[in-house]
């Protein structure tokens, strides 16, 4: 299916330069310039906090929905290829998730590469998740009803946090929501890296450049905490909701991850989104198709976070 006309028009109008050409500092400026603004959504509170982490304090933003708590808790890890973007650039989606799913969203400003190579980011995300589980009552949350979520490289962080929580003593998670996830270092370029190499937002070269910044060496990609698709087993992971953009270099690995979860017996909603490109959530409030994806997400989260255990 061709790109949605609105997405295609926006991509053609974008005047962006390759990150490899810009370098890290200017890449960060360019990436933030394209971030959506805050939606007009009422929440009970939005506050910034500092979380003790393995490399020092981790900045985080807590979005508390209206209504009577305690609310379930959704950890959120922002996208940006392990290198760019931050808390501010993802207000647009965190506010929607908090209001739509009636959960406290804890957005984590994990350490970025190249200043902080792998595994700094995943270590921060696990530490923040454990902190939120232990301190949820302080912000109107229920630490026994938690899920993880993220976009792109943030979805990598969410998937890895779910794996590590399973293998390294918790906390117990009720679900994981992965939007167009990065799940595997491209040792051999998948077909989608070639089909959608240019002209669809996230280019093949930008994604390869991100990996170069993130890993000390390609050998580190064998670690499932870097490439969660390489985990030995998906059994025992929390239920998953995985959304994959059709026209995206990450399409194939996103589908492969969802399929591996299903094959391992993990209850998984896997949805390829026709006519979309990477970062399609930025069209929330503009494209009905994107709003439908979010409506599905809200309903799915309400289901896994409010049902009784057992």
Where are these regions (language model features)?
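Short beta-strand element of the alpha/beta-hydrolase
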Residues: 70-80
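Hydrolase active-site cap/lid region
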Residues: 163-219
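Catalytic active-site module of serine/aspartate enzymes centered on a nucleophile-bearing elbow/loop
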Residues: 285-310
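Short amphipathic alpha-helix adjacent to the substrate-entry channel of hydrolases
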Residues: 88-107
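Short beta-strand/loop motif that positions the catalytic acidic residue
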Residues: 242-244
């Amino acid at each position: 299916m061709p790109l949605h006309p609105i997405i295609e028009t926006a991509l053609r109008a974008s005047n962006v330069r390759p990150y490899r050409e810009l370098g890290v500092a200017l890449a960060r400026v360019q990436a933030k310039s394209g971030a959506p603004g805050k939606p007009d959504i009422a929440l009970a509170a939005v506050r910034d906090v500092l979380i003790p982490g393995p490399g020092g304090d981790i900045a985080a933003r807590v979005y508390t929905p209206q209504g009577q708590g305690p609310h379930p808790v959704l950890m959120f890890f922002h996208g940006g290829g392990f290198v760019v973007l931050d808390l501010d650039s993802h207000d647009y989606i965190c506010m929607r998730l908090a209001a739509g799913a009636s959960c406290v969203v804890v957005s984590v400003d994990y350490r970025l590469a190249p200043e902080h190579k792998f595994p700094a980011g995943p270590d921060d995300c696990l530490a923040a998740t454990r902190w939120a589980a232990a301190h949820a009552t302080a912000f109107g949350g229920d630490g026994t009803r938690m899920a993880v979520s993220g976009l792109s490289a943030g979805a990598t962080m969410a998937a890895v946090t779910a794996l590590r929580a399973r293998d390294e003593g918790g906390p117990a998670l009720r679900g994981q929501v992965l939007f167009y996830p990065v799940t595997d270092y491209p040792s051999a370029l998948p077909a989608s890296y070639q089909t959608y190499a240019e002209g669809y937002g996230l280019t093949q070269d930008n994604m390869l450049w991100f990996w170069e910044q993130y890993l000390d060496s390609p050998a580190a990609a064998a670690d499932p905490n870097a490439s969660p698709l390489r985990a030995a087993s998906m059994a025992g992971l929390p239920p998953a909701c995985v959304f994959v953009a059709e026209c995206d270099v990450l399409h194939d690995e996103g589908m492969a991850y969802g399929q591996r979860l299903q094959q391992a017996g993990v209850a998984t909603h896997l949805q390829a989104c026709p006519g979309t490109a990477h970062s399609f959530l930025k069209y929330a409030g503009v494209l009905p198709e994107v709003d439908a994806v979010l409506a599905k997400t809200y309903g799915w989260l309400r289901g896994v976070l409010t049902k009784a255990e057992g």
